[in-house]
Amino acid sequence: ARRELAIGDGSTIVVYHGLGLFSAPRVWWMFRTFGVREVYILDGGMPAWKVEGRPIDFGEVRRTPRHFTPRFNRGAVADVEDVKKALALPDMQVVDARSKERFEGTGPEPRPGLPSGHMPGALNLPWERLLQDGKLVPPEAIEKVFSQAGIDVGRPIVTTCGSGVSAAILWFALEA
């Protein structure tokens, strides 16, 4: 699909979400996982773009297909064993991006069969706390938001959630 999108080696990529900042960090994370360094997120997504009065185009965009060489970034992914180890190590932090209710097991899960609650030892930082008016909070506020949740941004962090979308928001904020 990247070839048809004309995304290739050396491309600079800007991703955005139609409703603000929600799934764009997951796309950003996917590109970073496969070695793309020049990938960015349009903060606030399409709504912010429109509010700023920027041009909008309609219709299909035709581009020349390009070659992409994936370079897997193992450090961007934690498997089950990695997470178990992280939970057992005192210097590691596993941070769950789901709502407080889902984390505590008092709120419903959106997907059938997904158990409530959280991994023992995990910390909770609902992803919405990192947003303000549909955009990521200012850089100087990011560390404060993490700190208020009992998370030390100076120590290693593994982010998690129910599907990988909201965990990517936390990861993006940590990289911002």
Task: Describe the role of every protein-language-model region.
Residues 1-8, 79-154:
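Positively charged, proline/Ser/Thr-rich regional signature most characteristic
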Residues 43, 115, 119, 160-162:
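Short glycine/serine/threonine-biased micro-segments
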Residues 16, 95-97, 160:
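Short hydrophobic segments within beta-strands
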Residues 1-90, 106, 162-176:
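Thiolate-centered catalytic microenvironments shared by cysteine-dependent enzyme domains
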Residues 13, 155-158:
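Alpha/beta-hydrolase fold nucleophile elbow
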